[in-house]
Protein backbone atom coordinates (compact mmCIF):
# COMPACT_ATOMS: atom_id res chain seq x y z
CA UNK A 1 0.00 0.00 0.00
CA UNK A 2 1.31 3.45 -0.90
CA UNK A 3 0.92 6.48 1.36
CA UNK A 4 1.17 10.14 0.50
CA UNK A 5 1.71 12.95 3.00
CA UNK A 6 -0.70 15.79 2.24
CA UNK A 7 -0.42 19.06 4.23
CA UNK A 8 -3.63 20.27 5.85
CA UNK A 9 -5.17 23.27 4.09
CA UNK A 10 -2.42 23.40 1.48
CA UNK A 11 -2.67 26.50 -0.71
CA UNK A 12 -1.67 27.20 -4.28
CA UNK A 13 -1.01 30.47 -6.09
CA UNK A 14 -3.47 31.38 -8.85
CA UNK A 15 -3.77 34.36 -11.16
CA UNK A 16 -7.09 36.21 -11.17
CA UNK A 17 -8.78 37.80 -14.17
CA UNK A 18 -7.42 41.23 -13.24
CA UNK A 19 -3.86 39.87 -13.39
CA UNK A 20 -3.31 39.83 -9.62
CA UNK A 21 -2.38 36.64 -7.77
CA UNK A 22 -3.81 35.11 -4.65
CA UNK A 23 -3.45 31.90 -2.66
CA UNK A 24 -6.41 29.52 -2.51
CA UNK A 25 -6.90 26.09 -0.97
CA UNK A 26 -6.30 23.06 -3.16
CA UNK A 27 -9.34 21.43 -1.58
CA UNK A 28 -12.13 22.31 0.81
CA UNK A 29 -10.73 23.96 3.92
CA UNK A 30 -10.62 21.77 7.02
CA UNK A 31 -11.67 23.81 10.08
CA UNK A 32 -9.68 23.67 13.31
CA UNK A 33 -10.96 21.31 15.98
CA UNK A 34 -11.18 23.37 19.21
CA UNK A 35 -11.04 20.26 21.41
CA UNK A 36 -7.91 18.94 19.70
CA UNK A 37 -6.31 22.39 19.73
CA UNK A 38 -6.96 22.64 23.46
CA UNK A 39 -5.43 19.21 24.04
CA UNK A 40 -2.30 19.94 22.01
CA UNK A 41 -1.89 23.42 23.51
CA UNK A 42 -1.19 21.94 26.94
CA UNK A 43 1.73 19.95 25.54
CA UNK A 44 3.02 22.96 23.64
CA UNK A 45 2.95 25.04 26.83
CA UNK A 46 4.94 22.37 28.69
CA UNK A 47 7.49 22.27 25.89
CA UNK A 48 7.80 26.06 25.81
CA UNK A 49 8.32 26.13 29.58
CA UNK A 50 11.14 23.58 29.31
CA UNK A 51 12.81 25.39 26.41
CA UNK A 52 12.69 28.75 28.16
CA UNK A 53 14.34 27.35 31.30
CA UNK A 54 17.41 29.43 32.18
CA UNK A 55 20.58 27.35 32.44
CA UNK A 56 23.15 30.08 32.92
CA UNK A 57 24.47 33.51 32.06
CA UNK A 58 27.03 34.48 29.43
CA UNK A 59 29.29 37.52 29.30
CA UNK A 60 30.29 38.11 25.68
CA UNK A 61 29.49 36.03 22.62
CA UNK A 62 30.40 32.39 21.97
CA UNK A 63 31.07 32.02 18.24
CA UNK A 64 29.48 29.10 16.43
CA UNK A 65 28.56 30.52 13.02
CA UNK A 66 29.41 27.96 10.34
CA UNK A 67 31.20 30.58 8.23
CA UNK A 68 33.68 31.00 11.08
CA UNK A 69 33.78 27.82 13.16
CA UNK A 70 34.49 25.62 10.13
CA UNK A 71 37.52 27.73 9.27
CA UNK A 72 39.18 28.54 12.60
CA UNK A 73 39.32 27.74 16.28
CA UNK A 74 36.64 29.59 18.25
CA UNK A 75 35.72 30.15 21.87
CA UNK A 76 32.52 28.09 21.57
CA UNK A 77 34.38 25.21 19.94
CA UNK A 78 36.96 25.32 22.71
CA UNK A 79 34.29 25.47 25.42
CA UNK A 80 32.33 22.51 24.04
CA UNK A 81 35.46 20.39 23.63
CA UNK A 82 36.41 21.31 27.20
CA UNK A 83 32.95 20.47 28.57
CA UNK A 84 33.01 17.04 26.95
CA UNK A 85 36.63 16.46 27.98
CA UNK A 86 35.77 17.14 31.61
CA UNK A 87 32.66 14.94 31.49
CA UNK A 88 34.68 12.03 30.09
CA UNK A 89 37.60 12.71 32.45
CA UNK A 90 39.80 12.80 29.36
CA UNK A 91 43.17 14.37 28.63
CA UNK A 92 42.07 15.77 25.26
CA UNK A 93 38.73 16.96 23.94
CA UNK A 94 37.98 16.89 20.21
CA UNK A 95 34.76 18.28 18.74
CA UNK A 96 33.79 18.33 15.07
CA UNK A 97 32.64 21.78 13.93
CA UNK A 98 29.69 20.24 12.08
CA UNK A 99 28.18 19.29 15.42
CA UNK A 100 28.02 22.96 16.45
CA UNK A 101 25.09 24.63 14.72
CA UNK A 102 24.78 28.13 16.19
CA UNK A 103 26.37 30.84 18.33
CA UNK A 104 25.33 31.84 21.85
CA UNK A 105 24.68 35.53 22.42
CA UNK A 106 25.50 37.49 25.56
CA UNK A 107 22.95 37.40 28.37
CA UNK A 108 20.75 34.72 29.86
CA UNK A 109 21.24 31.30 28.26
CA UNK A 110 18.20 29.02 27.96
CA UNK A 111 17.79 25.33 27.24
CA UNK A 112 16.53 26.35 23.79
CA UNK A 113 19.87 28.08 23.13
CA UNK A 114 21.64 24.83 24.04
CA UNK A 115 19.48 22.75 21.70
CA UNK A 116 20.14 25.18 18.86
CA UNK A 117 23.83 24.38 19.30
CA UNK A 118 23.37 20.60 19.59
CA UNK A 119 20.14 19.53 17.83
CA UNK A 120 21.26 16.02 16.85
CA UNK A 121 21.46 14.20 20.18
CA UNK A 122 25.02 12.94 19.71
CA UNK A 123 26.58 10.99 22.55
CA UNK A 124 29.89 11.83 24.18
CA UNK A 125 32.33 8.94 23.89
CA UNK A 126 35.97 8.35 24.77
CA UNK A 127 38.81 5.99 23.97
CA UNK A 128 42.47 5.60 24.85
CA UNK A 129 45.56 5.69 22.66
CA UNK A 130 49.28 5.60 23.26
CA UNK A 131 51.18 8.73 22.35
CA UNK A 132 52.38 7.08 19.15
CA UNK A 133 48.84 6.03 18.22
CA UNK A 134 47.55 9.50 19.08
CA UNK A 135 50.09 11.08 16.75
CA UNK A 136 48.87 8.88 13.89
CA UNK A 137 45.27 9.74 14.78
CA UNK A 138 45.98 13.48 14.77
CA UNK A 139 47.74 13.18 11.42
CA UNK A 140 44.31 12.31 10.04
CA UNK A 141 41.90 14.40 12.11
CA UNK A 142 43.90 17.63 12.34
CA UNK A 143 44.36 17.69 8.57
CA UNK A 144 40.65 17.71 7.76
CA UNK A 145 39.85 20.53 5.36
CA UNK A 146 38.38 23.85 6.42
CA UNK A 147 34.86 24.71 5.28
CA UNK A 148 33.69 21.26 6.33
CA UNK A 149 32.01 19.81 9.39
CA UNK A 150 35.06 17.59 9.88
CA UNK A 151 37.24 20.57 10.85
CA UNK A 152 37.95 19.96 14.53
CA UNK A 153 37.90 22.11 17.64
CA UNK A 154 40.16 21.13 20.54
CA UNK A 155 40.76 21.30 24.27
CA UNK A 156 43.72 20.14 26.34
CA UNK A 157 46.13 20.03 23.41
CA UNK A 158 48.45 22.34 21.49
CA UNK A 159 50.19 21.52 18.22
CA UNK A 160 51.38 22.79 14.88
CA UNK A 161 49.57 21.38 11.85
CA UNK A 162 51.70 21.39 8.72
CA UNK A 163 49.35 20.96 5.78
CA UNK A 164 52.17 20.71 3.25
CA UNK A 165 53.88 17.84 5.07
CA UNK A 166 50.52 16.40 6.19
CA UNK A 167 51.82 15.99 9.72
CA UNK A 168 51.35 17.50 13.17
CA UNK A 169 54.34 18.63 15.20
CA UNK A 170 55.16 20.12 18.60
CA UNK A 171 52.26 18.27 20.22
CA UNK A 172 51.67 19.02 23.88
CA UNK A 173 49.00 17.47 26.10
CA UNK A 174 47.93 19.55 29.09
CA UNK A 175 51.03 21.68 28.51
CA UNK A 176 53.48 18.75 28.51
CA UNK A 177 55.28 17.31 25.44
CA UNK A 178 53.61 14.26 23.93
CA UNK A 179 55.02 11.03 25.41
CA UNK A 180 54.90 8.33 22.72
CA UNK A 181 54.73 5.58 25.36
CA UNK A 182 52.10 7.15 27.61
CA UNK A 183 48.39 6.34 27.32
CA UNK A 184 45.99 9.24 26.78
CA UNK A 185 42.21 9.43 26.95
CA UNK A 186 40.40 11.33 24.18
CA UNK A 187 36.77 12.50 24.27
CA UNK A 188 34.91 12.66 20.96
CA UNK A 189 31.29 12.72 19.70
CA UNK A 190 30.04 9.19 19.04
CA UNK A 191 29.27 10.19 15.45
CA UNK A 192 32.95 10.76 14.73
CA UNK A 193 34.08 7.77 16.76
CA UNK A 194 31.99 5.66 14.38
CA UNK A 195 33.82 7.13 11.39
CA UNK A 196 31.61 10.13 10.69
CA UNK A 197 33.24 13.00 8.75
CA UNK A 198 35.96 10.58 7.68
CA UNK A 199 37.47 10.26 11.16
CA UNK A 200 39.26 6.99 12.02
CA UNK A 201 36.81 4.41 13.39
CA UNK A 202 37.32 4.08 17.15
CA UNK A 203 34.24 2.09 18.12
CA UNK A 204 36.18 -1.15 17.65
CA UNK A 205 39.00 0.01 19.89
CA UNK A 206 38.87 -2.16 23.07
CA UNK A 207 39.05 0.98 25.23
CA UNK A 208 36.10 2.67 23.50
CA UNK A 209 33.28 3.79 25.82
CA UNK A 210 29.92 5.23 24.85
CA UNK A 211 29.16 7.28 27.96
CA UNK A 212 25.45 7.66 27.25
CA UNK A 213 25.76 11.39 27.95
CA UNK A 214 23.96 13.46 25.30
CA UNK A 215 25.98 16.42 24.03
CA UNK A 216 23.24 18.99 24.75
CA UNK A 217 22.89 17.76 28.33
CA UNK A 218 26.65 17.95 28.84
CA UNK A 219 26.73 21.54 27.58
CA UNK A 220 23.69 22.44 29.70
CA UNK A 221 25.35 20.99 32.79
CA UNK A 222 28.56 22.88 32.04
CA UNK A 223 26.67 26.18 31.95
CA UNK A 224 24.80 25.36 35.15
CA UNK A 225 28.01 24.55 37.01
CA UNK A 226 30.19 27.37 35.68
CA UNK A 227 27.79 30.29 35.22
CA UNK A 228 28.39 33.12 34.73
CA UNK A 229 30.63 32.14 31.83
CA UNK A 230 33.03 34.68 30.37
CA UNK A 231 33.44 34.12 26.64
CA UNK A 232 36.93 35.67 26.72
CA UNK A 233 38.19 32.81 28.90
CA UNK A 234 37.70 30.37 26.02
CA UNK A 235 39.22 32.42 23.21
CA UNK A 236 41.95 30.29 21.55
CA UNK A 237 45.48 31.67 21.86
CA UNK A 238 47.25 29.87 19.03
CA UNK A 239 47.21 26.53 20.81
CA UNK A 240 46.58 25.00 17.38
CA UNK A 241 48.63 26.59 14.60
CA UNK A 242 48.04 25.74 10.95
CA UNK A 243 50.82 26.19 8.39
Regions found by a protein language model. Name each.
Residues 14, 19-23, 78-243:
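Feature captures C-terminal
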Amino acid sequence: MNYQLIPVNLKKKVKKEDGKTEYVNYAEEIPQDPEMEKLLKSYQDKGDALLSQKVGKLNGKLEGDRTIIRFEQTNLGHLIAEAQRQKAKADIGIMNSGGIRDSIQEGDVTYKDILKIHPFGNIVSYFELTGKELLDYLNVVALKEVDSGAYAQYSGISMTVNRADKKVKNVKIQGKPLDLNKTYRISLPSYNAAGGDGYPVMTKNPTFVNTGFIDADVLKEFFEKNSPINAEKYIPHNEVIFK
